[in-house]
């Protein structure tokens, strides 16, 4: 399968050329012998692997990793550092899932072809310092898998994203400094996040930082979910914080007014600032 920024993150394991996940639920521990089995697949371009430690990661990178365009590091809980990855000059996509020890990124300056990077469930990684060195990066996602809340999954700041060329940002965690509006100073064109972590005013203020062309889940002030009961489906619409849940078919008029108010808030926050500058004005909706 040919991977791209549009399909790599959600690719099922059966679409990888090689699957070296260990049978243990926690990712297990992979052996040198298992890593050496890669030599039997010289044409493989995509790999999912689990159970690496610092020494076996270094071995994998030194002997085999350079042949892959896409690597998914699945449950490598004993890794304490990712420095070996700086040698991967040809890798295009990297996905990480679950680690409790890694505290910083690696030197990404030599990852000259890296287009997509996803990091999920890393409980000690709270800084993305160094991401700005990867000039080819277009797709970045960080947080908890499936958006599940975890107080240990957070970043200190988004400021380094201003120095990147990232166009897609997926965010499913907490932000320590609370400065979401800095994202409006980035190259982001598509933003996915959970709108329910914001009040209506906060989300409108954030979206107003971007041009009308912004795409993604962030531009919708709600998520949806359905429950089946005795063959009957009830669709729930979950709005921003502080707003009562809507039920489709029952609260349609209230939901329509909610969307209209949100749209008005975004438009109001985009009006030119009084000082005549080109920046956005972040006054509350309704101010004169």
Located regions from the model:
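Aromatic-rich beta-strand edge motifs centered on tyrosine
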Residues: 181-182
């Amino acid at each position: 399968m040919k991977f791209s920024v549009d399909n790599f993150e959600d690719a099922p394991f059966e679409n990888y050329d090689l699957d070296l996940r260990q049978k243990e639920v926690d990712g297990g521990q992979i052996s040198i012998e298992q890593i050496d089995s890669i030599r039997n697949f010289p044409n493989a371009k995509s790999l999912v692997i689990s159970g690496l430690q610092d020494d076996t990661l270094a071995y994998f990178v030194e002997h085999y990793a350079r042949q892959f365009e896409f690597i998914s590091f699945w449950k490598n809980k004993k890794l304490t550092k990712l420095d070996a990855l700086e040698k991967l000059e040809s890798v295009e996509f990297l996905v990480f899932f679950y680690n409790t020890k890694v505290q910083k990124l690696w030197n990404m300056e030599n990852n000259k072809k890296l287009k997509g990077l996803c990091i999920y469930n890393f409980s000690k990684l709270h800084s993305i310092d160094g991401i700005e060195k990867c000039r080819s990066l277009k797709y970045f996602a960080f947080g908890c898998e499936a958006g599940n809340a975890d107080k240990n999954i957070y970043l200190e700041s988004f400021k380094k994203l201003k120095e990147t060329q990232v166009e897609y940002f997926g965010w499913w965690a907490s932000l320590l400094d609370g400065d979401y509006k800095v994202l409006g100073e980035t190259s982001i064109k598509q933003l996915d996040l959970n709108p329910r972590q914001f009040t209506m005013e906060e989300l409108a203020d954030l979206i107003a930082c971007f041009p009308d062309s912004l795409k993604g889940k962030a531009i919708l002030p709600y998520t949806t979910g359905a429950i089946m009961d005795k063959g009957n489906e009830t669709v729930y619409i979950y709005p921003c914080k502080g707003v009562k849940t809507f039920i489709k078919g029952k609260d349609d008029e209230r939901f329509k007014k909610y969307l209209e108010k949100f749209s008005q808030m975004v438009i109001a926050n985009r009006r030119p600032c009084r000082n005549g500058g080109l920046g956005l004005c972040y006054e509350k909706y309704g101010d004169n």
